[in-house]
From Swiss-Prot:
Protein species of origin: Staurastrum punctulatum (Green alga)
HAMAP family: Cytb6_f_PetG (MF_00432)
Family of this protein: Belongs to the PetG family.
Known partners and oligomeric status: The 4 large subunits of the cytochrome b6-f complex are cytochrome b6, subunit IV (17 kDa polypeptide, PetD), cytochrome f and the Rieske protein, while the 4 small subunits are PetG, PetL, PetM and PetN. The complex functions as a dimer.
Principal location: plastid
Tree of life domain: Eukaryota
Designated gene of the protein: petG
Gene Ontology molecular functions: electron transporter, transferring electrons within cytochrome b6/f complex of photosystem II activity
Protein's UniProt keywords contain Transmembrane: yes
UniProt name for this protein: Cytochrome b6-f complex subunit 5
GO biological-process terms attached to the record: cytochrome complex assembly; photosynthesis
Pfam family, one: PetG
Length: 37
């Protein structure tokens, strides 16, 4: 009963975590560009 729920939570969190890391890296990259200017 618990395993499908747990796997669903994990599968749901993986894309969110990857998206968060991507956005953070993108914002840091933009900030670096602005500092260079």
């Amino acid at each position: 009963m618990v395993e499908p729920l747990l796997s669903g939570i994990v599968l749901g969190m993986i894309p969110v975590t990857l998206a968060g890391l991507f956005v953070t890296a993108y914002l840091q990259y933009r900030r670096g560009d602005q500092l260079d200017l």
